[in-house]
Amino acid sequence: MDYQKISDLLVKLILLSRQESVHPVRRTAAADAAYLYSELIDRDVDTMHYKQIKSDFVNAINNLKYNPGEYITSLETKKDKQYEIFQ
């Protein structure tokens, strides 16, 4: 597991969650994603599952930051529920 990449993603999520210019729903989503992603550091997960989770969160980060008019879907790792986050 690449802890440096996870740490970098966590920093981006935490910064997004604290930006006043970001929509409150997005800030909450970023904070929730950071919490879930931080659990990966302490959890031993299957490599393919990890890659899928990482891909989902990278897409979520990019969409939160660059595509404000579109909703994003991210996976909650514990319950595999889907969340749709709107502007």
Regions found by a protein language model. Name each.
Residues 8, 14, 22-23, 50, ...:
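General helical secondary-structure elements
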Residues 2-31:
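N-terminal acidic leader/helix
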Residues 10-13, 30-38, 57, 61, ...:
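Generic L/I/V-rich hydrophobic alpha-helical segments across diverse proteins
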Residues 52-87:
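Amphipathic alpha-helical binding modules
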Residues 18-28, 42-50, 66-73:
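Charged, low-complexity interaction regions
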